[in-house]
Amino acid sequence: MKLSKLSILTSALATSALAAPAVVTVTEHAHEAAVVTVQGVVYVENGQTRTTYETLAPASTATPTSTATALVAPPVAPSSASSNSDVVLSALKNLASVWGKTTDSTTTLTSSESTSQSLAQATTTSTPAAASTTSTPAATTTTSQAAATSSASSSDSDLSDFASSVLAEHNKKRALHKDTPALSWSDTLASYAQDYADNYDCSGTLTHSGGPYGENLALGYDGPAAVDAWYNEISNYDFSNPGFSSNTGHFTQVVWKSTTQVGCGIKTCGGAWGDYVICSYDPAGNYEGEYADNVEPLA
């Protein structure tokens, strides 16, 4: 079986004038034969926020190999911004994210010169008024398993403050769910994640590693805060209808029952972007058809 071939590519643009289009999302749904691209544009017209969608020409056949998700904390709008700015920046919190199984997903968040250099820390992941396009992965019968990679583990007493706090936050969230075991820290995963983080250029563009692991990315959060932001997507998850949703992929990877190990890396970018965090998971989560068995309800 193959991984469900789904990638979502989002770019969010914030300018001082907030001229239309304010937010653009592009969703690629890769089936066995081809990739269909749907572009959604969120814009403000006569004081009203509107969304339009357009199906673009199919792209070439995709062969993604890994699971990857990302989350960006957007810059805060200046105090003089109009109410339309608030609407658009609220949309950015959820739309500037990437979820999927991909080797080449990219998220770009561009801040204008008039944008504040501080970052908004997300406290909720509820869906904004500006809608985004959601695709459901093509059905598969893939059995969850990671690539054949041995992961050396560390005892909690050997961990750095960053590793200890991120692992503890993951396990705190997992403990809230029925029959969901704690994760152990993997030095192999952490080394992979840190190597990738060290090469990040702090540009505000998030590009997934395309490696063999599950992957969550965040920009503008420290380690524990990134885990909190990912987990807060639980508010959008429908336990009565388990499955894929573009705005719950971070949450489902954090609590994925079959995942046993995690390792994370961090790079301090400073300025507008703050910290860049990447967490790798083994075995990877978010397999189509396995949500009911791996995303348990609250205890």
Swiss-Prot record:
Cellular component per GO? endoplasmic reticulum; extracellular region; extracellular space; fungal-type vacuole; nuclear envelope
Its job: Secreted protein required for efficient export of lipids such as acetylated sterols. Acts in detoxification of hydrophobic compounds.
The annotated region (Disordered) lies at: 103-157
Q: How is it modified after translation?
A: O-glycosylated.
**What protein name does the entry list?**
Protein PRY1
Q: Where is the SCP domain?
A: 167-281
Give a yes or no for keyword Signal in this entry.
yes
Report keywords, A-Z: Glycoprotein, Lipid transport, Lipid-binding, Secreted, Signal, Transport
According to the UniProt entry, its GO molecular function terms are:
cholesterol binding; fatty acid binding; magnesium ion binding; sterol binding
Q: Where in the cell is it found?
A: Secreted
Task: Tell me the PROSITE patterns matching this sequence.
Answer: CRISP_1, CRISP_2
Note from the entry:
Present with 556 molecules/cell in log phase SD medium.
The record's section on InterPro entries has: Allrgn_V5/Tpx1_CS (IPR018244), CAP_dom (IPR014044), CAP_sf (IPR035940), CRISP-related (IPR001283)
The entry's family comment says: Belongs to the CRISP family.
Q: Which gene encodes it?
A: PRY1
Q: Tell me where the signal peptide lies.
A: 1-19
Q: What is known of its domains?
A: The SCP domain is necessary and sufficient for lipid export and sterol-binding.
The record lists the lineage as: Eukaryota, Fungi, Dikarya, Ascomycota, Saccharomycotina
Which organism does this sequence originate in? Saccharomyces cerevisiae (strain ATCC 204508 / S288c) (Baker's yeast)
